């Protein structure tokens, strides 16, 4: 899924649904030691509010804008549900030579994500996300003119599916298989996946709204 992105980096938000609320970040987080950003500006940003900073008439706004020029800008996030009891979120800047850093670990993610900018927001979800592990949702190019969201039905971070049998013969008499044929094969496997999308003119979705969307 692709969507145009507009506005300042500090007004671009991402939120993933998690098993205990949500994980929310901005592409340029206005938490700075030098220059010091006014707490009320940073607090409004963390709540998902759009910031309309007037550097010409507000010194606090001018300081925040200057600080934003020296922040790391996060371009890509990946949530991977690699087992029935673990998911991770990692992020990186746009430079391909730089590594990912970890953002969060949890148990079971619902498979929902919300991305917002100054023009509105959109939410996407995948039904039975954690149950169908290893699954992943990746959001990239968040600092560019067009962002993309990819739902991976098989998370590329984990090992490839292995269809080899665990042994070179059957054990129908001594164990549970009931037949001697070695039948490990991908033939005949099928799965239906359901995805939902919601578009909004409003700013970033809060955690409760994203949960309602994911549960619907």
Q: Each PLM stretch: what is its role?
A:
Residues 1-216:
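Beta-strand/loop-rich accessory regions of lumenal/periplasmic or secreted enzymes
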